[in-house]
Amino acid sequence: MGRKFFVGGNWKCNGTTDQVDKIVKILNEGQIASTDVVEVVVSPPYVFLPVVKSQLRPEIQVAAQNCWVKKGGAFTGEVSAEMLVNLSIPWVILGHSERRSLLGESNEFVGDKVAYALSQGLKVIACVGETLEQRESGSTMDVVAAQTKAISERIKDWTNVVVAYEPVWAIGTGKVATPDQAQEVHDGLRKWLAANVSAEVAESTRIIYGGSVTGANCKELAAKPDVDGFLVGGASLKPEFIDIINSATVKSA
């Protein structure tokens, strides 16, 4: 059984009730590939999670953009994994580069978050990626391997983990890794998993690409053998997100 294509839409800190209604309408009315071909998850801000979940067509799942590293309590402003489970939110994004860079989340902290979220029954989109400076110094694989290692040291079961490779220099910049650049890192990550976790985990774990994915470049990226889908930012707020979802058909063509 091949790896099912996975498309995540990260709305980040965007949206009003009117805008959310419009995005949900686009998603509900769009012609999208069947769930046999693609798994689709959208991640609105916390405040919109319940309404989006209740209004979206059932084929599209929802994810939180973050959760706390342990059980809830006196952690003002945080949302716990248990709360998400209570709301029947199946997925969470963890380790996004914006949280790593702006909020100082370390590899170890992200690894702890992933382990705790999984322990509570959530599925995790775990983000890794390098900065422009790190890429230019030739340390891309060292960086993403260290980020992945911090996760692998803390979990035993990878069944509910999707790894999102997001080159930081290509997020929101309009720059995009070439399909060959994306494939190179995805292949490197898969080889790392094979060597450090298991061949089975390497073969079955989906590694998706996140970095200025658009309707214009998605098919070329999707055609690469180790690109198992996308984590989409700005384009997930627009009608072209439907085209990105449907790029999954490239795999089954």
Curated annotation (Swiss-Prot):
Location of the protein in the cell: Cytoplasm
Signal peptide bounds: none
Q: Pfam families from the xrefs?
A: TIM
Q: Does the keyword Cytoplasm apply?
A: yes
Active-site residue list: H96, E166
Supply one GO BP term.
Answer: glycerol catabolic process
Statement: the UniProt record of this protein carries the keyword Mitochondrion: no
Main EC class of this protein? Answer: isomerase
Catalyses:
D-glyceraldehyde 3-phosphate = dihydroxyacetone phosphate
One GO cellular component assignment for this chain's record is: cytosol
Gene Ontology MF terms: triose-phosphate isomerase activity
Q: Which SUPFAM superfamilies match?
A: Triosephosphate isomerase (TIM)
Please provide the record's keywords in A-Z order. Answer: Cytoplasm, Gluconeogenesis, Glycolysis, Isomerase
Q: In which pathway does it act?
A: Carbohydrate biosynthesis; gluconeogenesis; Carbohydrate degradation; glycolysis; D-glyceraldehyde 3-phosphate from glycerone phosphate: step 1/1
Other remarks on this protein = In plants, there are two types of TPIS, cytosolic and plastid.
Family statement drawn from the similarity comment of this UniProt entry: Belongs to the triosephosphate isomerase family.
Assembly and interaction partners: Homodimer.
HAMAP family in the record, alphabetically?
Answer: TIM_B
Name of the protein in question: Triosephosphate isomerase, cytosolic
Protein source organism: Oryza sativa subsp. japonica (Rice)
